[in-house]
A protein has these predicted regions:
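Amphipathic alpha-helical dimer-interface segment in Rossmann-like NAD(P)H-dependent oxidoreductases
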Residues: 77, 118-140, 149-150, 182-186, ...
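Catalytic loop of short-chain dehydrogenase/reductase
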Residues: 95-96, 110, 143-176, 181-190, ...
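Canonical Rossmann dinucleotide-binding motif of NAD(H)/NADP(H)-dependent dehydrogenases/reductases
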Residues: 6-39
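Catalytic Tyr-X3-Lys loop
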Residues: 106-126, 143, 170-172, 177, ...
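A conserved structural motif in NAD(P)-dependent oxidoreductases
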Residues: 222-233, 244
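Conserved NAD(P)H cofactor-binding loop of Rossmann-fold oxidoreductase domains
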Residues: 92-100, 258
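Short C-terminal tail/terminal secondary-structure segment
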Residues: 2-6, 238, 249-262
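Short, small/polar-rich loop/turn modules that mediate ligand/substrate recognition or access, typified
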Residues: 189, 194, 248-250
């Protein structure tokens, strides 16, 4: 066994939804660095996500709205038209509803609740469903993004009036992602399609770190006493995309600084 080749993605066609986002862009970069042909799928090609004078870390950009089945279908069809198949799908994109004042359970209406659940869970479901035809022949790897709040409740005491206060629909949706990952792993195993999840802990975007009190309280909830840096999620994604995880399916890798372990 040549262990150096276990993480080699040469010849793999990798699609990352939400690929211009804070965590998604790191997924794109590491998959490209390890030899993958990377397709960035997002609502817009955000130039400010890439450092000055740095070449884009992807081979193709496709506009994709993960709230729309037709948009996802068109995205995957465009990738297949150019490359012939899809080997890896990273379902990173999601959207929320009900943050801030509308986050309290007793005041949330049905429409807002359902929209938030769809933004967390429906996005992963649609991505998995629509990519299957492109992976059936040769197998593949699907990686879903869960959340620590799909495993444990947020400690609402630390949020106060912070606009990032977690609504109930987000955690409910992400808990669903963990379960549908296990279900899909079983359902798609006959095609050689592996389905796993990664669960980030606190990885706040630096643009949202103005509240010093809240940031410190959030960091103190981890065993390591700090936030995660965006690149620290990338290794788990690389593992699951590569042959290094060839005997892994239905798994959920938690990268949370110990948040959910105590």
């Amino acid at each position: 066994m040549d262990y150096k080749k276990l993480f080699d993605l040469s010849g793999k066609i990798c699609v990352v939804t939400g690929g211009t986002g804070y965590l998604g862009s790191e997924n794109v970069k590491i998959l490209k660095d390890f030899g993958g042909t990377v397709v960035c799928a997002d609502l817009r090609e955000a130039e400010d996500r890439w450092e000055k004078n740095e070449d884009k870390a992807y081979d193709m950009f496709v506009k994709c709205d993960v709230s729309s089945t037709e948009s996802i279908k068109a995205c995957f069809a465009a990738v297949a038209e150019k490359y012939g198949r899809i080997d890896v799908l990273v379902n990173c994109a999601c959207y929320g509803a009900g943050y801030g004042k509308g986050s309290q359970l007793e005041f949330m209406d049905d429409e807002t609740f359902n929209k938030g659940v769809d933004g967390a869970l429906g996005t992963a479901f649609r991505g998995m469903r629509e990519v299957v035809p492109y992976m059936k022949e040769k197998g593949g790897s699907i990686i879903n993004y869960c959340s620590m709040y799909g495993l444990v409740s947020p400690d609402l005491r630390i949020y106060g009036d912070n606009p990032q206060k977690q609504p109930p629909n987000y955690g409910a949706g992400k808990a669903g992602v963990a379960q549908i990952t296990r279900y899909a792993a079983c359902s798609l195993s006959e095609y050689g399609i592996r389905v796993n999840a990664v669960t980030p802990g606190p990885f706040p975007n630096p643009k949202n770190q103005d509240d010093v009190r809240f940031n410190q309280a959030l960091a103190n909830k981890t065993m390591l006493g700090r936030f995660g840096q965006s690149y620290e999620m990338a290794g788990a994604v690389l593992l699951l995309a590569s042959d290094a995880s060839s005997f892994m399916t239905g798994s959920n890798i938690v990268v949370d600084g110990g948040w959910t372990a105590w």
